[in-house]
Regions:
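Hydrophobic alpha-helical segments
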Residues: 1-138
Length: 138
């Protein structure tokens, strides 16, 4: 629901963006750079991260679009559900577990982020650029 009188109650993101096509055009370039540009993460991994954050935010539209994109890009369909249920038992490379814990905390309780959250990512061999990319996807 867009809460805008000119929009129907079932407006989609594209409908809201149509109010300001110029800004939307710039946003598309930013989004393309974040989701498809150079990164330590594949496009599928970034789509999985975005789907995960969207599920935590209860954004059905974004969760659906990002999870479908992740699947098209080779991510197993059940992986998102496994991550939502329990990061520790999800069937994902252990290097990704602190990344999804970081995303969860940043999404649900951002004021509680501490250096240790980033350090857990670094401890798995990721660098500052990887952390930056995780934050940008979020």
């Amino acid at each position: 629901m867009p809460f805008m009188p000119s929009m129907p109650a079932d407006a989609l993101v594209k409908d809201v963006y149509s109010l300001d096509p110029q800004t939307f055009r710039y946003w598309l370039h930013v989004e393309e750079a974040i989701m498809r540009g150079a990164s330590a993460f594949t496009a599928g991994e970034r789509e999985l991260m975005a789907a995960y954050v969207s599920r935590l935010n209860s954004c059905t539209y974004c969760a659906s679009s990002h999870s479908e994109a992740a699947i098209v890009l080779g991510v197993e369909r059940q992986l998102l559900e496994a991550l939502i249920a329990d990061i520790d038992t999800a069937p994902i490379d252990k290097r990704f577990k602190p990344i999804f814990k970081f995303l969860k905390k940043l999404t649900l309780t951002p004021s509680k982020m501490i250096q240790g959250d980033a350090d857990a990512i670094y401890a798995e061999g990721w660098d500052e650029r990887a952390l930056h990319d995780v934050i940008m996807v979020c």
